Amino acid sequence: MRLDIRYLTRFRYATAISESQNELRACPATDHRQALVHYHVTTEPASRVASYLDYWGTRVDTFGIREPHAQLEVVAEATVETQVPVRPRTAVPTASLQEARFHDLHLEFLQPSPHVSWSSGVARAAHELAAGVDDDVVALAQAVHDRVADLEYRTGVTAVGVSVDEVFSEGGGVCQDFAHLAAAMLRELGVPARYVSGYLFTADDATGEDVIDDEVEVETHAWVEAAIPGWGWFALDPTNRQDVGERHVTIGRGRDYDDVAPLRGVFVGDQRHELDVSVSMRRLALAPLGDVAFGRSMQQQ
């Protein structure tokens, strides 16, 4: 599937601010299931945009605006081609999670992190769930996905920074909450799990249903990936109770939301502001990729 994506963020400040320094994470990655065809960032006021890959491998676009300004607009436009990822089909014994090399390579995705810290209640629920699952890491990851997918999708009941325990006790939230809770339960069970930020071409964030028209307004999305020994990362979308597919577009991966927040920055001035964010996605007819290729398979450990 080929998709055009337009990400827009607009800040309106109460009074003019200055010395604005910002980091944007909105660029689709190139990996084993998607290839970036085109990407461009513009800002108003205009600025010079520099780019680098952060510690987690996510592209970061940085820009600064020194002169006073009462409004900031950031537009990121991308074209990306995706394909359906391969799903693990063979059972993987859970004992393989304890292999020293695998454990050491994934240690950062086994530990608690700022938004993925949990108490005994979540831990107990995870182990009770695991007790009814066959000796198979893939089945275990699927069971955690299914359990989290049973939560209710509810907007406005949580905010960035809400704890995993609160999401679990409230029984609902949005995609970031689902991804954080799934990561917590997987890590508790010894399965490395990472948070993924991206876009989803869908008519409804709560169901993930496909789009009849070729263009739709969406929001940024989040899901989780579980590391399967000897296979790679298994991507699951508990918000929409589905495997990650060709309508999912990955931006970046990290321990939790903080590692892949779309836009963050600092400035000098009154912090009061209004914020508007919009994302539009358009499905295109497939065309030859030319010299753009999917990245080396990330199924390798």
Predicted regions and their residues:
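Linear, non-domain "peripheral" regions
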Residues: 1-124, 128
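Glycine-rich, flexible loop/turn motifs
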Residues: 13, 48, 93, 98, ...
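Actinobacteria-biased recognition of intrinsically disordered, low-complexity terminal regions
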Residues: 289-301
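Glycine-rich, small/acidic residue-mixed loop/short-helix segments
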Residues: 24-34, 39-41, 240-274, 281, ...
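Glycine-centered loop/turn motifs
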Residues: 77, 132, 213-215
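Structural beta-strand/beta-sheet cores of well-ordered domains, especially the beta-sheet scaffolds
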Residues: 1-3, 7, 20-22, 39, ...
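Hydrophobic/aromatic-rich core segments of domains that either
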Residues: 177-271
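Secondary-structure boundary elements
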Residues: 98-173, 181, 255-257, 279-287, ...
